[in-house]
């Protein structure tokens, strides 16, 4: 966590491969020949004097990784004794300003801020909690929890004991709270980084345990479908602690043993936000691109657009698996994600989101 970005140069490798060991496909990759100072100078020129070169800003910030954007911010501060965020805010407006500010903040802080607002005031936006906690692994969860303390400080909180966990406990209860805590406490099974790096050569079989998967399948059946009543804690301990690869294997074995999918079992034996969370964790392991495609569709469904959800999902997935999500979206909805976003957004905000998805704009457009 000593890197310039809270998640380091890349997200945890546990997100990098599908259940069969195939690399997920990002739309944003590290920039060849990257120079933070050169980008900082170009950004400064694009905002200097009358008028703003919005396309130049987009083509830099929306094509860089989060790690690169943090380096650009530091170079900008060093060169011009001014925060890049302040200059962007003074030169832009509306949703375009919002998405630029989301792009240049480090990822843990962006997610922590989303969680803060999800639990602020009356009611809780459980959709945000589920979308974020489902997609973080142990080291990332710790980084977000640390960033949450900084968000509280920035918002003027003087309660030294207040934290992500204390706020979450106030806003949730019962089995749902227990499951969230299982994720937030960052004690899920982990895989050594060298084993993750070896997946392309050795395959997923090198990091999964068939005996454990069979035992978990039996335990899950015994906790619900195979008894009167449901043991939610036993279900939670398996679903919220295993790696995605281990959960995928367990779901395969469960179907072979009982002729019913594990997902069907969870949906029939649980309810409410607790069910939504477990289903999301399981689907993240089984068919992640389709799950996140549905989240993106929901962010644009109905009257108005949930812009912060749309921004968060596109920004955070762009370096991991956004190309696979785009393919899943078109398969599910018969329309490209790119066109769906274009239909729901406008102007430079639209262009920024489209560049995150791989669209190319030249200076004449």
Curated annotation (Swiss-Prot):
Ca(2+) 2 binds at residues 52, 54. The keyword Magnesium does not apply. Keywords: Annexin, Calcium, Calcium/phospholipid-binding, Disulfide bond, Metal-binding, Repeat, Secreted. The keyword Lipid metabolism does not apply. It comes from the Eukaryota. Ca(2+) 7 binds at residues 304, 344. Annexin repeats lie at residues 34-105, 106-185, 211-283, 287-358. GO terms for cellular component: cytoplasm; extracellular exosome; host cell; membrane; nucleus; plasma membrane; vesicle membrane. This is Annexin B22. It comes from Schistosoma mansoni.
């Amino acid at each position: 966590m000593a890197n310039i970005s809270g998640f380091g140069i890349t997200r945890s490798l546990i997100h990098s491969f599908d259940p069969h060991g195939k690399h997920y496909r990002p739309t944003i990759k590290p920039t060849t020949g990257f120079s933070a100072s050169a980008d900082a100078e170009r950004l400064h020129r694009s905002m200097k004097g009358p008028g703003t070169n919005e396309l130049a800003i987009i083509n830099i910030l929306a094509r860089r990784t989060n790690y690169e954007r943090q380096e650009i911010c530091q170079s900008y501060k060093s060169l011009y004794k001014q925060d890049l965020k302040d200059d962007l805010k003074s030169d832009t407006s509306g949703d375009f300003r919002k998405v630029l500010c989301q792009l240049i903040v480090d990822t843990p802080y962006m997610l922590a801020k989303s969680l803060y607002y999800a639990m602020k005031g009356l009611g809780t936006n459980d959709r945000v909690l589920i979308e974020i906690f489902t997609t973080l692994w142990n080291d990332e969860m710790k980084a977000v929890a640390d960033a949450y303390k900084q968000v509280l400080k920035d918002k003027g909180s003087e309660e030294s004991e207040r934290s992500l966990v204390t706020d979450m406990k106030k806003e949730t209860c019962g089995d749902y709270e227990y499951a969230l805590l299982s994720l937030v406490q960052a004690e899920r099974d982990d895989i050594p980084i060298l084993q993750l790096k070896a997946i392309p050569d050795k395959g997923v079989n090198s990091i999964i345990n068939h005996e454990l998967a069979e035992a978990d399948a039996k335990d899950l059946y015994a906790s619900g479908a195979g008894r009167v009543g449901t043991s939610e804690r036993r279900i939670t301990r398996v679903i919220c602690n295993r790696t995605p690869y281990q959960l995928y294997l367990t779901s395969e074995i469960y179907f072979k043993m009982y002729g019913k999918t594990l997902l069907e079992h969870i949906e029939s034996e649980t309810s409410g936000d607790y069910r939504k969370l477990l289903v999301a964790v399981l689907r993240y392991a089984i068919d992640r691109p389709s799950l996140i495609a549905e989240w993106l569709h929901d962010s644009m469904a109905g009257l108005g657009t949930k812009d912060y959800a749309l921004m968060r999902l596109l920004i955070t997935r762009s370096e991991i698996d956004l190309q696979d999500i785009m393919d899943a979206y078109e398969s599910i909805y018969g329309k490209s994600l790119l066109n769906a976003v274009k239909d729901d957004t406008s102007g430079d905000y639209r262009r920024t989101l489209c560049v995150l998805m791989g669209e190319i704009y030249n200076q004449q457009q």
